[in-house]
């Protein structure tokens, strides 16, 4: 006996006459649309679902025994019982002449009404300006779970009533599942209220989370930690923008001549230019997850962590070189403006707010043109030099971290290279990258000169970097610290070896705990080797 899946009440079937739509002829133009390319799915794998349903079509039962909905436009004669289907209630029965009718109590399947949505909202059946301009539309974005419920029915309804498909591309997205991969449902109680997420993290953070790392048609798991990371990115954009606009208030920013642009300026302009080209290609292919990741990485890493930091020196020393400061501010404003346009489809609220303050004389960001690739913003050599600067900076920071040198301790940096063009370009960067390289002086040479014998070296493409060890480390203090670390590690290794030698532990403890202890022993052993090497190097 069938029962209701929620309350357990016995379900008693009642046979009743239903209204159907004959589907054979309606399905043909919908099938032809996909096969001729007039309609396409992204990703293409959903073509199969569409065609399988239409090529195995069954007549559509459109009557529902519920009160809410559009009532079936069928009227029964109170005298003879015959029915009339009409837009309005008939004045008299064509069979017996009776003037009294009762409308069918059934309502239309909700998908029957929804199938008319693309054109009914535009004034159809009247031939309105909106219908002529907006129909057919370009892209429909929807989930794979309603392809046959809604998408197919909109397509054949569009052909039947207008002679055209309602759209030419169907972009399919997946479902948002909980952190365990389960579909959200009331019965599981695992639903997420988007309004609560928006109140806590903001609408832009939620939007960014839902699209980052996702491919069309694939499900995603929802984690609050991801929304928090998106909120942090929004804060990063906001703070960088505030820094730029705060400094613009103190200066009249004018577009500089090309020859004034520094290598870092040319590099970031080249980067945002390449980003524009790549993102445009991604968006055209509906690779939204790839596109948003690229603009996220560009803003966070290349713009904020590198260019803004390099530009600070020039801005803070405007009295010494006002031309350079103006140039840096113009580049900051220009690149930020373009980055905001690229980010806008994904985070519309924060980008609109910032853009309105950044360039108040321009129209709304929503109404502005999408950025275009510019040939005159391609600077391959500047990009190459900047990659050298980044490699050198990372090498220095990694070496200092290995040697536990605090960031507030500055040292000389020697950069040795046989590439004269590279040295010339690095000369321009010297002052502005000192803070990034944690240096009090940067010395450039063609050959190793005036470098202490005990200086540590870092090999990067095109150059070798030397850091004087005496500037970095108090030898006695470091030896003492390393000795204590050696004692601690020996103690940990002895403890782990003792536990693993205990048969009761290895045979009775959970396997994951035993493995965790083995992992600790391996980790401590490697750390001890590194500490001993450091002690030897300080003798």
Regions found by a protein language model. Give the residues of each.
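Residue patterns forming the tRNA-binding/recognition surfaces of aminoacyl-tRNA synthetases
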Residues: 1-79, 150, 182, 188-189, ...
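Structured, non-catalytic alpha/beta "coupling" segments that mediate domain-domain communication
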Residues: 1-23, 227-252, 345-357, 424-464
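Core structural elements
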Residues: 232-245, 265-274, 293-315, 359, ...
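Acidic, turn-prone loop/beta-hairpin segments
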Residues: 101, 178, 211, 251-280, ...
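Alpha-helical recognition segments enriched in aromatics with Gly/Pro capping
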Residues: 66-69, 73-79, 83-218
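Short amphipathic alpha-helical coiled-coil/interface segments
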Residues: 54, 234, 272, 276, ...
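C-terminal low-complexity, glycine/proline- and small-hydrophobic-enriched intrinsically disordered tails
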Residues: 357-539
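Glycine- and acidic
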Residues: 35-48, 129-143, 190-192, 215-227, ...
């Amino acid at each position: 006996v069938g029962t209701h899946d929620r309350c357990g009440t016995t379900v008693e079937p009642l046979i009743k006459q239903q209204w159907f739509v004959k589907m054979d002829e309606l399905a043909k133009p919908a099938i032809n649309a996909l096969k001729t390319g007039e309609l396409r799915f992204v990703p293409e794998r959903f073509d199969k679902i569409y065609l399988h349903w239409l090529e195995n079509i069954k007549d559509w039962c459109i009557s529902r025994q519920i009160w809410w909905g559009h009532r079936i436009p069928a009227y029964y004669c109170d005298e003879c019982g015959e029915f009339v289907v009409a837009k309005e209630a008939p004045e008299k029965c064509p069979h017996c002449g009776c003037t009294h009718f009762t409308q069918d109590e059934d309502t239309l399947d909700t998908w029957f009404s929804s199938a008319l949505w693309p054109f009914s909202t535009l004034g159809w059946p009247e031939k309105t300006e909106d219908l002529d301009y907006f129909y057919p539309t370009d892209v429909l974005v929807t989930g794979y779970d309603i392809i046959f419920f809604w998408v197919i029915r909109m397509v054949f309804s569009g052909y039947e009533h207008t002679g055209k498909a309602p759209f030419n591309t169907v972009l399919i997205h997946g479902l948002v599942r909980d952190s365990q991969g389960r579909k959200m449902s009331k019965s599981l109680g695992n639903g997420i209220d988007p309004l609560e997420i928006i109140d806590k993290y903001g609408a832009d953070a939620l939007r960014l989370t839902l699209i980052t790392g996702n491919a069309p048609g694939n499900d995603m798991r929802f984690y609050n930690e991801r929304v928090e990371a998106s909120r942090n990115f929004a804060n990063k954009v906001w703070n960088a923008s505030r820094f730029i606009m705060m400094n613009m208030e103190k200066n009249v920013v004018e577009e500089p001549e090309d020859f004034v642009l520094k290598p870092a300026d040319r590099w970031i302009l080249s980067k945002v230019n390449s980003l524009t080209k790549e993102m445009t290609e991604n968006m055209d292919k509906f690779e939204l997850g790839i596109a948003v990741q690229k603009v996220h990485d560009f803003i966070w890493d290349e713009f904020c962590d590198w260019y803004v930091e390099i530009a600070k020196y020039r801005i803070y020393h405007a009295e010494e070189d006002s031309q350079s400061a103006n140039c840096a501010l113009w580049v900051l404003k220009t690149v930020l403006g373009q980055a905001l346009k690229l980010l806008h489809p994904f985070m519309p609220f924060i980008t609109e707010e910032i853009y309105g303050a950044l360039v108040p004389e321009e129209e709304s960001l929503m109404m502005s043109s999408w950025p275009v690739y510019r040939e005159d913003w391609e600077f391959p050599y500047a990009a190459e030099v900047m990659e050298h600067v980044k490699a050198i900076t990372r090498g220095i920071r990694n070496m200092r971290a290995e040697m536990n040198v605090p960031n507030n301790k500055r040292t000389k940096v020697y950069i040795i290279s046989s590439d004269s063009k590279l040295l010339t370009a690095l000369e321009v960067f010297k002052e502005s990258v000192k803070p990034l390289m944690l240096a009090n002086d940067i010395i450039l040479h063609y050959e190793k000169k005036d470098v202490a014998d005990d200086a540590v070296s870092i090999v990067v493409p095109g150059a070798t970097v030397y850091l004087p060890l005496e500037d970095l480390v108090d030898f006695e203090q470091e030896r003492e610290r390393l000795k204590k670390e050696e004692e601690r590690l020996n103690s940990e290794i002895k403890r782990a070896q003792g536990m693993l030698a205990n048969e009761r532990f290895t045979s009775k403890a959970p396997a994951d705990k035993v493995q965790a202890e083995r992992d600790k022993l391996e980790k401590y052993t490697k750390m001890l080797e590194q500490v001993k090497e450091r002690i030897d190097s300080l003798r």
